[in-house]
A protein has these predicted regions:
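Detector for methionine-enriched segments
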Residues: 1-3, 51, 130, 183, ...
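Solvent-exposed edge beta-strands and adjacent loop segments
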Residues: 2-110, 163-180
Length: 215
């Protein structure tokens, strides 16, 4: 189902599920990347299992493998924008704007004081995110404060996948001299509707303590 339109409409108006407690993502401090593989976590028990996460970080021979970034700084996810045509003119009926879709969101952040080798391995992930124009084979999980992970439940509501990302780019290093950090700017894109089925789960361990095996 599109986030914009459900066709045909229901026989009557549906309800709006109440949110009993506010859900704040707070700060994203690390990211976990993997190839598209919706069934890497078999169920809710596996998803909150420290052993399951560590096993996926240490797998080297299949597409269920995960990799975790160093700490990231300043990560922001802008709200997507509505794409419209016309409005208040003769190009549309009664001058009503036509809604054509939802635009992409460009996620930006920085990684401080990493080696050239680490930056290059992140760039290899970028290759997975732009196999050809408009095609990606990589997803991302967001690791938040309070030991939480944000993931994609998908339309079925029972998956534990990451969010599809496109065009992951790591720039050249930036340095402003004495008593400053060396910085890499990083960004990727997510298509309109990316967050329709997001889930938020506090894990019984600190996922930001996880690390990749030695290369």
């Amino acid at each position: 189902m599109s986030m914009l339109f459900k066709c045909p409409p229901g026989a009557y108006l549906g309800g709006i599920v109440p949110t009993t407690c506010p859900i704040k993502w707070d700060q994203t401090q690390k990211l976990v990347f993997g190839r598209k593989f919706a069934d890497r976590f078999a169920n809710a028990g596996a998803f909150i299992s420290q052993m399951a996460w560590y096993s996926l970080l240490n797998i080297t021979v299949n597409d269920s493998r995960l990799v975790i970034t160093p700490y990231v700084s300043g990560l922001t996810i802008p709200a997507t924008t509505v794409l419209t045509k016309g409005g208040n003119d003769n190009t549309t009926i009664d001058g009503v704007p036509e809604i054509n879709g939802i635009g992409f969101a460009t996620v930006k952040f920085q990684i401080k004081n990493i080696s050239a080798e680490t930056a290059d391995e992140l760039r290899l992930l970028g290759t997975e995110s732009m196999i050809q124009p408009g095609v990606s084979n990589i997803v991302a999980y967001f690791l938040q404060t309070s030991d939480a992970v944000v993931w994609n439940k998908t339309s079925t509501g029972d998956k534990y996948d990451g969010f599809e990302i496109f065009n992951l780019v790591v720039t050249d290093i930036g340095n402003e001299g004495l008593n400053t950090n060396t910085m890499y700017d990083v960004q990727f894109d997510m298509k309109g509707g990316w967050s329709q089925y997001w889930g938020y789960q506090v894990l019984p361990f600190n996922p930001r303590d996880m690390s990749n095996p030695a290369s």
